[in-house]
Amino acid sequence: MERPEPELIRQSWRAVRRSPLEHGTVLFARLFDLEPDLLPLFQYNCRQFSSPEDCLSSPEFLDHIRKVMLVIDTAVTNVEDLSSLEEYLAGLGKKHRAVGVKLSSFSTVGESLLYMLEKCLGPAFTPAVRAAWSQLYGAVVQAMSRGWDGD
């Protein structure tokens, strides 16, 4: 896999980093639009959400959004040395597998990430920026997928 363009990723992430919860909410709203079957996977204290809006407004889910955005931020920070995150990301993959996430759903998460970036960046979301983020996300998912492979 080609290495992502670090400067394009860092520069575009600066805009997102200013309001990670807001942009993360856009990402997950899009995810639930594209793959509504994921909603039941998010249960906190045995509470099932009746709608994406119910989920997106819950304090527990907002905490999950913050954590996801922090993982993305960590990947951006380490974009030139993603191998340093491989063990952590494989563990994260294993946790997702344990709660019933299918590896195939990460394709939809990637689409949702690109959607969020496009909404946040507007005209600055160029084909080169899109390609750089696709490469970064692909590398992250590749590392996370090791959590599905091994025990």
Swiss-Prot record:
- Where the record annotates domain Globin, the positions are 1-149
PTM comment: the record says: Phosphorylated during hypoxia by ERK1/ERK2. Phosphorylation regulates the heme pocket hexacoordination preventing the association of His-64 with the heme metal center. Thereby, promotes the access of dioxygen and nitrite to the heme and stimulates the nitrite reductase activity. Phosphorylation during hypoxia is stabilized by 14-3-3 proteins.
Q: What is its EC number?
A: 1.7.-.-
Write the record's keywords in alphabetical order, separated by commas.
Cytoplasm, Disulfide bond, Heme, Iron, Metal-binding, Mitochondrion, Oxidoreductase
| Domain of life per record | Eukaryota
Instruction: Identify the Pfam families for this entry.
Output: Globin
Q: Does the keyword Magnesium feature in the UniProt annotation?
A: no
Question: GO MF annotations for this entry?
Answer: GDP-dissociation inhibitor activity; heme binding; metal ion binding; nitrite reductase activity; oxygen binding; oxygen carrier activity
Q: Which reaction does it catalyse?
A: Fe(III)-heme b-[protein] + nitric oxide + H2O = Fe(II)-heme b-[protein] + nitrite + 2 H(+)
Which PROSITE patterns does this UniProt record tie to the protein?
GLOBIN
- Self-association and partners: Monomer. Homodimer and homotetramer; disulfide-linked. Mainly monomeric but also detected as part of homodimers and homotetramers. Interacts with 14-3-3 proteins; regulates the phosphorylation of NGB. Could interact (ferrous form) with G-alpha(i) proteins (GTP-bound form).
**Record's family?**
Belongs to the globin family.
- Write down what this protein is called: Neuroglobin
Species source reads Canis lupus familiaris
